Every structure is written in C-alpha cells, then in structure tokens.
C-alpha cells in the first residue's frame, strides 16, 4: 500500500520527498561529512559502500512505491541538511515502522533532527495509520540518544549485534512509541515541554552489557 510522501514543515525545518535531482547535493554532503558520519553509517558485510546516489535514490523511491518506506530530504532554511528514512513499514496487525536519519555536521545543535523525527512520526501516526514507531541507536551515539530523550521515545531494550555499522555488527538500544501515548502528537508534546523525563532512561545493566560488547568488539 503506497503512501504519498508529504512535505512537512515546522519553523526553519522542512522534510520533503527526496528527488533524483538531490543526488549531486547528497553525494557532496556525504563526502564532505565522512569523518562525521562514517562511524554511524550502515554498511554491507558482503560488499563495499556505494556512492551511486541516483541508484540509491531510485531504490528508496521504488521501496516507497511498494509501500515499505518513506524517504525524506531534510532542509534547514531551504538548504539541504540531511536525510530521514521511514523504513520497514508493516501494515495490518503490526502497524509498525522504523526511523533512521542523519544531518551534516554544520547543522548539528540546531534541533533539526528532533524536529524532523517528530514531523515524520506524527505523519506516520495520524496520516499513514502506523501504530508503533521505532528508533534503534548505537550506545555510543550520544547526539542521537539526545534526540529520543528530547522526544520521549521509550527505551525498550538492547539488541545485540543488530545492524552492520562501519564495518562490523553493532549493538543497538531500541526506543519506540505507540500512537495511544500521544493524543497531541510528538511535536506538540515536545514543544509544550510535557515529555516524560524517564522515558528514554537506559537501565544500568544494559549500559554495562553494551560497554562490554563494545570493548570486546574493539579487541580491548
């Protein structure tokens, strides 16, 4: 079931459908931000990372037409700032999807990412009919952990060696929300300052387990 990809805005932040003509800008941002993004990038354990941006965008668009994803470009004051992808969309009895994102280093600290995530999550809940939205984050990715803390995504557990990132299988913390928790929406709750403080709290046992896994994976 294909869902039309909207253009959504709040203040200086816009998320819109990614387009083939974004390929050159997307490639430039990824290359210019290699040091900033490489350690968080999903990688293919069976092949090299591809920088064929047009092919990547076509794949995202085909996935969207099949009803499995919503690929967005993120803009700040009209300037290309990053990407947000809603993926693994499942309808019916599960009604679930996953969010992934990145922004260029020069845009960090401007609340662009939480705003983009809130816009996308509210759309998925209230327009696309999703019931549950999930974000999985590497334990050492402090800026991304701050995003789920700001928006009140609930911590749901540690997933061991879950996604291949930067050349190896990495542990991830899992956070989620369900639509019943948010009658006013994610963005409004954040802007109103009513996000529960403890939602994103990670149990100490999981912090220790992730830390041990990281040391073992680094050969320490």
Regions found by a protein language model. Give the residues of each.
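Short, charged low-complexity intrinsically disordered segments located at boundaries
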Residues: 52-63, 87-91, 152
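A short helix-loop-beta-strand connector motif used in the catalytic cores of GNAT acetyltransferases and
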Residues: 45-47, 58-73
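Conserved GNAT-fold acetyl-CoA-binding loop/helix
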Residues: 38-58
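Residues that form generic nucleotide/phosphate-binding pockets
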Residues: 29, 40, 56-59, 63, ...
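Acyl-donor (CoA/ACP) binding surface of acyl/acetyltransferases
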Residues: 1-25, 29-36, 71-220
């Amino acid at each position: 079931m294909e869902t039309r990809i909207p253009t959504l805005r709040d203040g200086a932040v816009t998320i819109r459908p990614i387009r083939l003509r974004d390929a050159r800008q997307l490639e430039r941002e990824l290359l210019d931000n290699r040091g900033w993004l490489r350690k968080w990038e999903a990688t293919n354990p069976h092949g090299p990372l591809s920088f064929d941006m047009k092919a990547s965008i076509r794949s995202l668009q085909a996935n969207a037409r099949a009803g499995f994803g919503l690929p967005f470009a993120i803009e700040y004051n009209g300037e290309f700032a990053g990407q947000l992808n809603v993926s693994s969309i499942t309808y019916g009895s599960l009604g679930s999807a996953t969010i992934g994102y990145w922004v260029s280093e020069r845009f960090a600290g401007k609340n662009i990412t939480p705003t983009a995530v809130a816009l996308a999550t509210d759309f998925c809940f209230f327009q696309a009919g999703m019931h549950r939205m999930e974000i999985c984050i590497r334990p050492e990715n402090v800026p991304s952990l701050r995003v789920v803390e700001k928006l009140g995504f609930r911590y749901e557990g540690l997933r061991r060696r879950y996604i291949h990132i930067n050349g190896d299988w990495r542990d991830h913390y899992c956070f989620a929300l369900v639509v019943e928790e948010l009658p006013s929406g994610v963005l409004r709750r954040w802007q109103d300052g009513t996000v529960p403080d403890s939602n994103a709290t990670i149990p100490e046992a999981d912090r220790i387990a992730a830390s041990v896994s990281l040391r073992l994976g680094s050969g320490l």
